């Protein structure tokens, strides 16, 4: 009897020691990076806390910043093989970091840990390069119009349904409200996307010819592109870059003319609209506007893209655990509840079901309503990620400044942008 008890005690002790040794070996340390504002930081930290409760052997170190400097920091990390295990990434980074699909870990390899069935295959296709899934799109977003309801009412105008109505609104704002009032304010990246929409409606062709690694527009069409910009500025539809620059370099939604309603609308991602609306002087709020369409247009020319993605670093030593973390954030009850709509209306089917049931997703919410409207518009023509290349966007910003500061004519600017842009595209697509 004593021997049996002794054997049992020895076996139990060995099992306990074995379990402790296994637990110690099984401890995993992950790093996760993202950018955003304080609201995004807080909900993501809460979600990581919940993940650790369910997986106490997995520690996640959070590396979060604002937008400024985030890309350059990540570029250095990726080049040195020191990137985080899990990263919030942008869709237009795929051509920069992963031209052949090997720049990020292939998520098709961790299907056991990551429930890909919750995502529309069409959306996953956008983030797949050479058959390798480089990121899970968290949500999709589109640029659409939102207007300051109080200021537009004061101007006595209905929200523009056509391009002509948009162009005519500037004169009314100037005459009725004063020279400092504009129907919309657009930063250079917003302007680039808006005029592309107009050109797509008119010509039904893509902006970039990926097969030939250059722009698809003719020289005459580029002149028309920049003429449209100058027309909007001349018609007082939007402030020039020169006037805009006089208010400093802070975020547009933190500038005084935005807060007090002098800039009475924007063409913005539906997923980010809350922070723009929250900064308005109450009781003013942003409301969704119609989308201007040219007669007979077959495509709205919307800029649709994944709002952000979650990717796994190609250098990770823990791909399975990294995939578990992504799955928790996007598909689990606790992760979905913690993140809410901070990164837009989620693409995960189970997340949408949960958030609708809990009343978080409401069709009248400006962000949700904006996405629903965008999805109803004709939008078969996809946007090339090269259109959103940081160098192309920066080049456009320089180009319209040349016009606003009188340094180049529209014709000269069109030629300059076409020539320099083709060079950028050729290098980027090598």
PLM feature segments, named:
Residues 91-143, 167, 285-289, 363, ...:
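Hinge/lid segment of periplasmic solute-binding proteins
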Residues 134-138, 143, 167-222:
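Extracytoplasmic/periplasmic solute-binding protein
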């Amino acid at each position: 009897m004593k021997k049996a008890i002794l054997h049992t005690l020895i076996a139990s002790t060995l099992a306990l020691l074995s379990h402790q040794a296994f637990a110690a070996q099984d401890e995993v340390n992950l790093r996760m990076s993202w950018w955003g504002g304080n609201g995004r930081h807080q909900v993501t930290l809460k979600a990581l806390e919940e993940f650790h409760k369910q997986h106490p052997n997995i520690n996640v170190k959070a590396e979060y910043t604002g937008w400024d400097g985030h890309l350059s920091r990540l570029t250095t990390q990726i080049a040195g093989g020191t990137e985080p295990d899990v990263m919030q990434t942008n869709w237009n980074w795929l051509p920069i970091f992963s031209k052949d699909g090997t720049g990020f870990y292939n998520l098709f390899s961790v299907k056991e840990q990551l429930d890909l069935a919750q995502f529309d295959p069409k959306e996953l296709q956008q983030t797949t390069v050479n058959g390798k899934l480089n990121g899970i799109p968290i949500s999709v977003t589109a640029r659409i119009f939102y207007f300051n309801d109080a200021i537009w009412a004061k101007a006595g105008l209905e929200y523009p349904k056509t391009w002509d109505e948009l162009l005519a609104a500037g004169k009314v704002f100037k005459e009725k409200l004063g020279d400092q009032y504009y129907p919309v304010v657009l930063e250079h990246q917003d302007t680039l996307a808006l005029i592309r929409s107009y050109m797509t409606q008119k010509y039904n062709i893509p902006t970039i010819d990926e097969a030939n690694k250059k722009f698809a527009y003719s020289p005459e069409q580029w002149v028309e592109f920049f003429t449209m910009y100058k027309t909007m500025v001349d018609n007082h539809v939007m402030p020039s870059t020169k006037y805009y620059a006089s208010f400093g370099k802070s975020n547009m939604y933190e500038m005084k003319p935005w807060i007090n309603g002098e800039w009475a609308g924007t063409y913005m991602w539906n997923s980010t609209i809350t922070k723009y609306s929250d900064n308005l002087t109450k009781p003013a709020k942003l409301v969704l506007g119609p989308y201007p369409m040219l007669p007979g247009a077959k495509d709205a020319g919307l800029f649709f893209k994944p709002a952000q993605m979650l990717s796994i670093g190609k250098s990770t030593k823990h791909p399975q655990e990294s995939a578990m973390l992504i799955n928790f954030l996007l598909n689990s009850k606790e992760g979905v509840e913690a993140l809410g709509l901070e990164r837009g209306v989620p693409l995960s089917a189970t997340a949408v079901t949960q958030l609708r049931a809990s009343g978080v997703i409401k069709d009248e919410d400006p962000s949700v309503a904006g996405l629903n409207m965008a999805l109803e518009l004709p939008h078969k023509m996809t946007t090339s990620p090269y259109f959103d290349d940081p160098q192309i966007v920066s080049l456009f910003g320089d180009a319209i400044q040349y016009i606003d500061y009188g340094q180049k004519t529209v014709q000269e600017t069109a030629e300059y942008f076409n020539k320099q842009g083709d060079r950028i595209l050729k290098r980027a697509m090598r």
